[in-house]
Structure formats: structure tokens, C-alpha cells
Swiss-Prot record:
Family of the protein in this entry: Belongs to the pterin-4-alpha-carbinolamine dehydratase family.
Organism: Chloroflexus aggregans (strain MD-66 / DSM 9485)
Descriptive protein name: Putative pterin-4-alpha-carbinolamine dehydratase
Molecular functions per Gene Ontology: 4-alpha-hydroxytetrahydrobiopterin dehydratase activity
Protein keywords: Lyase
């Protein structure tokens, strides 16, 4: 899959305002859940989405906060896959 241009990344980020660009090659969002079990349940849901998409995020859990970072390693940056998975993750919590 082709790496996105800066203009394409900017366009996609406008549609995903809760996500931010870091290091010019990944998008990141931190989710705040009710408690640790809710955070684990959320991560489990993300894991099933990621596995189905064949695209696996970096996930960091800190009690009730979950940080998710998306990039396409084999493309060396962001692709449509990252923004598609970000959209699917956003839908988990409505």
C-alpha cells in the first residue's frame, strides 16, 4: 500500500480530529475509559479489529488510559490502512 503524502495526511486528520500526527509517520490517540477493566475490554475489541484488518497498532495501557499509535511499517509511514483502522477504533466508543 502506498504511503500517503503530507496533503493526504492533513486531509485525513481533518476527519479524525481526536488523532494527532507524531514523528511525521504515525497517528496517535489516547482514550480515557472508566477503569482498568473497561480499558482492557476496549483493547480486546481493538485487537479483534486489528487482527481482522491484518494491521496491528502499538498499544500502551496505563490504568484507565489507552494510547494507540498507528503506522504502516512496511510502507515507512502512514497509509490508508492506518486511517481506516483509526475510524473503526473510533466507532467502538461511539
Amino acid at each position: 500500500m502506498a504511503r500517503l503524502s503530507e496533503a493526504e495526511i492533513t486531509e485525513h486528520l481533518a476527519q479524525r480530529p481526536d488523532w494527532s500526527l507524531e514523528n511525521n509517520n504515525e497517528i496517535v490517540r489516547t482514550f480515557r475509559l472508566a477503569n482498568f477493566p473497561a480499558a482492557i475490554a476496549f483493547v480486546t475489541h481493538v485487537a479483534f479489529l486489528a487482527e481482522a484488518a491484518g494491521h496491528h497498532p502499538d498499544i500502551d495501557i496505563r490504568y484507565n488510559r489507552v494510547r494507540i499509535a498507528l503506522t504502516t511499517h512496511d510502507a515507512g509511514g502512514l497509509t490508508e490502512k492506518d486511517f481506516a483502522l483509526a475510524a473503526a477504533i473510533d466507532e467502538i466508543l461511539g
